[in-house]
Amino acid sequence: MQIVRALPDIAKTRTEFETYTLQWVGMEDIAVPLTLNIGGGKQQSLPAKANVYVSLDDAAEKGIHMSRLHAILNQLASQVCDKEGLDLLLRNMVASQGKISRSAKVELVFDLLLPKPSLLSNETGFQTYRIEIGGQCLSEKYDYSLKITVPYSSTCPCSAALSRQLFSDAIDNEFSTSRIDKQELLSWALTSTVATPHSQRSYAYLNLLLGNHGWPSLSSFIMQIEEAIGTPVQTMVKRTDEQEFARLNADNLMFCEDAARNVKTLLEQSSWIEDYWFKVEHQESLHAHNAVVIDQKYSKGAML
């Protein structure tokens, strides 16, 4: 006959350390599958990493019940991850700790995979965007945040002007007479690369505070960001798409300040955003350093 013995649980013993409350105790980097509404009536299932925390408000308690938090987090695998679902998750996290916790926090980090059509050729590729959804319940008050990283292309206006000057000088050197044959000029232009403006892959990092509001369609909002900047990076391209991409960059020459103002205009027009912090980063191909702009709506230290 097998004897069933009770397993020791030292967490129930009183702490031998100083009795202090602790703001956040939990686990980080937990794997969990998510299902998200991405817009247009579509859903996407994807792998994510989660950080979960609760407050330890009973100073006499040795620690929290971590396995209970893990079990509650696993429930996300069988439901759509939206504000209502995270409200319930946070409430259950607090309740799972008995009376030793009054607050809970969750952070979900994942790569959203979206189809991206080519500019002209009707081809389609796929692009990932790093997303972080954060939620917390403080004394039954809910607050949410959304972090998004969006890459784009930027071409320097100063470099473009310098390149145009060199091209003008080359025409002057090549054609010495005051009258130039149009066809001869066109033929020369097609075979003569005098100078090219420098451009680079750039990034917009957005940290948005939503208050007690849900987030919009992620795919639609990402598209709005890309349209505001004007030069989104591409996936699958053919020569006609690459040429159109070159035209877009010429039509949207920008310093980092220009990109930042375009982003800020969009954020200011988005009524569902209560506060924001953002950074645009141009990873210079001319310089060995990056050009950046950092801005925020309100001067809140938590956003820095």
From Swiss-Prot:
Annotated site, May be catalytically important, chain positions: 156
Q: Which UniProt keywords apply?
A: Hydrolase
According to its UniProt record, in which pathway does this protein act? Cofactor biosynthesis; 7,8-dihydroneopterin triphosphate biosynthesis; 7,8-dihydroneopterin triphosphate from GTP: step 1/1
Catalyses which reaction? GTP + H2O = 7,8-dihydroneopterin 3'-triphosphate + formate + H(+)
The protein's job, in short, is: Converts GTP to 7,8-dihydroneopterin triphosphate.
Which one GO biological process term can you cite for this protein?
tetrahydrofolate biosynthetic process
Similarity remark? Belongs to the GTP cyclohydrolase IV family.
Going by the entry's taxonomy, the superkingdom of the source organism is recorded as Bacteria
Keyword Phosphoprotein among UniProt keywords: no
Class in the EC hierarchy, top level: hydrolase
* UniProt xrefs under InterPro entries: GTP_cyclohydrolase_FolE2 (IPR022838), GTP_cyclohydrolase_FolE2/MptA (IPR003801)
Q: What is this protein called?
A: GTP cyclohydrolase FolE2
GO-annotated molecular function: GTP cyclohydrolase I activity
Q: Any idea of its EC number?
A: 3.5.4.16
